[in-house]
């Protein structure tokens, strides 16, 4: 009865809860954004998970137009996520959790080289660094924890303490869990502002949120904002679900923004997109969401198509649980991808991040004569993928990781493969010359290839696949949006 009464109140007063409009900065799977203001420059990075080589760092001068500048290409420490990118003095720091601990890498130049990872041996996830006006460094982690660091920020310097309990949202709200995480710290006008996430990263559409607290000391007491939640999805009817994991940043002209991630309800398998919306500082020293402010448009994302004829692999490519820079080569003959394993479950994968609800990917493939196969997939994880791979004799058309249909390969060892993602329904086509196409499968449902079904907080990605003992060749990879803009 109480839950029904609360839902009635929400329905009656929904205009009071209507969220601000937002700017879509990066469509596709760009979760857990961390934004650094460095003079007139802005840098942003996101979770890397099992996609190697490592964290991709972007650069902007206006928060709207972003270009990739480097990968943090270091030793793999396990699935790495929720980073915090900072600059102290003339050194860049990237803190991140992986393998049950927290790590840091450093660089004098944002483009690298970056150091080897240092294990801080600090518990918790989602690290957030703060440097006090006196120069002391502290690392916050999930659950309201804080750990003092050494003066160089490369080791702990004391015990971890719990200093913040979070903001108590109404019990009737439909969330995944309390899950106090994503602490991001800002020093502003005599206060430390702690921006956190609560409610769970996925699960119900209304789960995630951004909340704020402030204190005169990193050890508290922390006072929760009267404007909480700063960002939240109040209804499953909203376009953006599970909005959370926010970082606040001062943009050009003194306008402040909160940058966060969210799922597109119409393309959940696409992952968590990066968005931002304006905030303002109040006369009583809090920041809050801004309503009815005209918003700028973000620039287009860099293209994903690749002819593989350059001197090095494009920025858009990653390996799955292994660093592609160690084995993928490009040149006048295209991409050479050494085979591994016997199927997409254990084979070699090279992936890119889709940006659209509907898109077409196409590639030209040359398969070795024997003991090898190659293909084009939409890949979430080993438990969830669809697409086609083939050797010189047969096609295997995957509806999912456990079910495939085998049919004769009448195209031979050289062919073109096309995947058409039509709002989470997949069509698979092949061609011998790139002009006349044969449809192998239609309307394979891929809408359930996402975290709420398979876990891991990943996204469905186009993937080149090479299996067996020899190298397969790929040319003319094309990615085309099917969305009318």
Which residues fall in each region the model found?
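Bacterial Sec-dependent N-terminal signal peptides
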Residues: 1-22
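Carbohydrate-active catalytic/glycan-binding domains of CAZyme proteins
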Residues: 20-485
């Amino acid at each position: 009865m109480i839950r029904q009464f609360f839902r009635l109140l929400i329905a009656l007063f929904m205009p009071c809860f209507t969220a601000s409009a937002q700017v879509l900065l990066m469509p596709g799977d760009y979760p857990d954004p961390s934004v650094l203001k460095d003079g007139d420059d802005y840098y942003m990075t996101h979770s890397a998970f099992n996609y190697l080589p490592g964290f991709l760092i972007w650069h902007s001068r206006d928060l709207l137009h972003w270009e990739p500048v480097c990968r943090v290409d270091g030793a793999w420490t396990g699935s790495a996520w929720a980073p915090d990118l900072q600059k102290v003095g003339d050194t860049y720091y990237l803190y991140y959790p992986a393998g049950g601990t927290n790590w840091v890498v450093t660089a004098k130049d944002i483009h690298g080289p970056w150091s080897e990872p240092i294990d801080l041996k600090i518990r918790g996830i989602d690290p957030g660094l703060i440097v006090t006006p006196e120069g002391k460094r502290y690392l916050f982690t999930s659950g309201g924890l804080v750990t003092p660091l050494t003066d160089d920020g490369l080791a702990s310097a004391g015990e971890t303490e719990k200093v913040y309990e979070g903001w108590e949202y109404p019990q009737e709200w439909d969330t995944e869990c309390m899950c106090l995480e994503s602490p991001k710290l800002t020093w502003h006008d005599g206060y430390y502002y702690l921006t956190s996430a609560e409610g769970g990263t996925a699960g119900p559409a209304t789960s995630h949120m951004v909340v704020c607290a402030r204190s005169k000391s990193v050890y508290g007491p922390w006072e929760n904002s009267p404007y909480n939640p700063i960002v939240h999805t109040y209804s499953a009817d909203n376009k953006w679900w599970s909005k959370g994991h926010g970082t606040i940043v001062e943009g050009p002209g003194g306008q402040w923004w909160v940058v966060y991630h969210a799922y597109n309800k119409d393309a959940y398998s696409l992952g968590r997109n990066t968005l931002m919306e304006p905030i303002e500082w109040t006369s009583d020293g809090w920041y809050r969401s801004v309503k009815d402010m005209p918003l700028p448009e973000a620039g287009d994302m860099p293209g994903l198509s690749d002819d593989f004829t350059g001197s090095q692999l494009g920025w858009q490519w990653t390996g799955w649980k292994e660093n592609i820079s160690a084995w993928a080569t490009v040149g006048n003959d295209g991409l050479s991808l050494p085979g591994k394993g016997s199927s997409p479950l254990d084979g070699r994968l090279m992936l890119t991040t889709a940006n659209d609800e509907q898109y077409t990917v196409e590639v030209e493939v040359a398969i070795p004569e024997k003991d090898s196969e190659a293909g084009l997939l939409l890949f979430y994880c080993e438990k969830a993928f669809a697409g086609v791979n083939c050797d010189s004799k047969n096609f295997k058309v995957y509806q999912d990781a456990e079910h495939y249909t085998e049919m004769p390969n009448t195209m031979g060892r050289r062919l073109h493969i096309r995947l058409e993602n039509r709002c989470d329904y997949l069509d698979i086509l092949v061609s011998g010359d790139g002009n006349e196409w044969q449809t192998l499968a239609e309307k394979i449902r891929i809408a359930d290839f996402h975290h709420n079904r398979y876990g891991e907080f990943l996204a469905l990605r186009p993937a080149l696949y090479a299996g067996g003992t020899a190298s397969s060749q790929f040319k003319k990879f094309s990615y085309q949006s099917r969305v009318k803009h």
